[in-house]
Amino acid sequence: MAIVDTAIDGINYFLSLSLTQQITILVVFPFIYNIAWQLLYSLRKDRVPMVFYWIPWFGSAASYGMQPYEFFEKCRLKYGDVFSFMLLGKVMTVYLGPKGHEFIYNAKLSDVSAEEAYTHLTTPVFGKGVIYDCPNSRLMEQKKFAKFALTTDSFKTYVPKIREEVLNYFVNDVSFKTKERDHGVASVMKTQPEITIFTASRCLFGDEMRKSFDRSFAQLYADLDKGFTPINFVFPNLPLPHYWRRDAAQRKISAHYMKEIKRRRESGDIDPKRDLIDSLLVNSTYKDGVKMTDQEIANLLIGVLMGGQHTSASTSAWFLLHLAEQPQLQDDLYEELTNLLKEKGGDLNDLTYEDLQKLPLVNNTIKETLRMHMPLHSIFRKVMNPLRVPNTKYVIPKGHYVLVSAGYAHTSDRWFEHPEHFNPRRWESDDTKASAVSFNSEDTVDYGFGKISKGVSSPYLPFGGGRHRCIGEQFAYVQLGTILTTYIYNFKWRLNGDKVPDVDYQSMVTLPLEPAEIVWEKRDTCMV
């Protein structure tokens, strides 16, 4: 009763104060409590050092959100590779560098969870029952189902389809209209997301489905994409316009896929070797005998296309911008491409999947772009059990989060010489190649979707690692390589401005700040 009486006395005293005094206490007390909590937290020797912050709950969100890599480096210089910070009410523990990659990417499933970290963000976009809205074992099998469309035989058929889509885009899109003009200005943040959607849908979903994809459909995917922002990560559902557009886009795209799935089932028009949709209609039964529902298949199709769209749209936008700043590199790429085609006695229409493997500068340009601009600058996992940081006294509590940033290592001079320079030829160096190889890269592990390298202790991991490693790396290189060679064969281009745009970190994907434009002109070999 003494505690209750004391509490009542405290409330009565507070109510007896003037309004100004009450407001002052309500405003000041959270700050005092916040500072006191941080001081007490810092006394615990088993806790990772925390970056000091003034504003309760908000924490270091501004510094991290505006320039994450600069924030990480500043913290590293003060605390070392392991530190924590407050991000909108969540304690994030960061472990930088290859040891951090190993610690987080290869953490035990029982200790960390991507599903718990991301489901509230991804489920409104992809839909229920897939990706992070299901047990991890289900996700591993879903990745295996999707890999049926990512075989070498499939890639061989994708190259001419991608090339045709890009050439048609050059002819028909207002940014180019190459039948009507020889030069113009194109915004890469308009052209590349659309080209990515059109080429990926043609390859993965088939010719008939591609015909139903127009610019309005690309806009629906853009509306979905806007659901991947920091505010969505914290507040999955708010009564705001971009949330409404996200939900409307999800319903329309899902209904479109469901209509096609129903048509194929009713007509019996199913060939598992034709495209991903047919493959999933035939090969989507889990090991325990449960079959994916048609709605789950439709949702998985959204996830597959969205996952690839992030990487390829941002990467192709960035390599166009960097190449615009280096005309000599464009000429070197053109020479590499045309020399190969001369040996074949043909033109760009004769370029094959096998030929793409014989273009080292093309592939190194993609590789260098992914180094400088890893699409996702941070990857999160929620800690499910107390997690000890190797070779330290630190223990990360259950309920906190761990954060890995391969993109930080990509852009650090600790691992790459002059990391701020776009230099595809760095990958011709044996030293650079060696630095990007994991210590145990020859070891493999199968999480349920095929064998992958177990090693993640590398400073270069553009497609992630561990059980959540992206399965679309080879498809990305096919898609990006075909897009790049089609641009190089048909155009020269330069920046429509003084320099390559800065990175927009306000979204969760590292896109160029707009305006991001190139001025293009036809080459003599232009085909359209």
Swiss-Prot record:
Heme binds at residue 470. GO terms for biological process: ergosterol biosynthetic process. Its main location: membrane. Keywords: Heme, Iron, Lipid biosynthesis, Lipid metabolism, Membrane, Metal-binding, Monooxygenase, Oxidoreductase, Steroid biosynthesis, Steroid metabolism, Sterol biosynthesis, Sterol metabolism. The keyword Ligase does not apply. Pathway: Steroid biosynthesis; zymosterol biosynthesis; zymosterol from lanosterol: step 1/6. Pfam families: p450. It is found in: Membrane. Its EC number is 1.14.14.154. One of its GO terms (cellular component) is perinuclear endoplasmic reticulum. The keyword Ribosomal protein does not apply. It catalyses: a 14alpha-methyl steroid + 3 reduced [NADPH--hemoprotein reductase] + 3 O2 = a Delta(14) steroid + formate + 3 oxidized [NADPH--hemoprotein reductase] + 4 H2O + 4 H(+); a 14alpha-methyl steroid + reduced [NADPH--hemoprotein reductase] + O2 = a 14alpha-hydroxymethyl steroid + oxidized [NADPH--hemoprotein reductase] + H2O + H(+); a 14alpha-hydroxymethyl steroid + reduced [NADPH--hemoprotein reductase] + O2 = a 14alpha-formyl steroid + oxidized [NADPH--hemoprotein reductase] + 2 H2O + H(+); a 14alpha-formyl steroid + reduced [NADPH--hemoprotein reductase] + O2 = a Delta(14) steroid + formate + oxidized [NADPH--hemoprotein reductase] + H2O + 2 H(+). One of its GO terms (molecular function) is iron ion binding. It is an enzyme of class 1 (oxidoreductase). Its cofactor is heme. PANTHER family: 24-HYDROXYCHOLESTEROL 7-ALPHA-HYDROXYLASE, CYTOCHROME P450 FAMILY 7. Sterol 14alpha-demethylase that plays a critical role in the third module of ergosterol biosynthesis pathway, being ergosterol the major sterol component in fungal membranes that participates in a variety of functions. The third module or late pathway involves the ergosterol synthesis itself through consecutive reactions that mainly occur in the endoplasmic reticulum (ER) membrane. In filamentous fungi, during the initial step of this module, lanosterol (lanosta-8,24-dien-3beta-ol) can be metabolized to eburicol. Belongs to the cytochrome P450 family. This is Lanosterol 14-alpha demethylase. The lineage of its organism: Eukaryota, Fungi, Dikarya, Ascomycota, Saccharomycotina. The gene is ERG11.
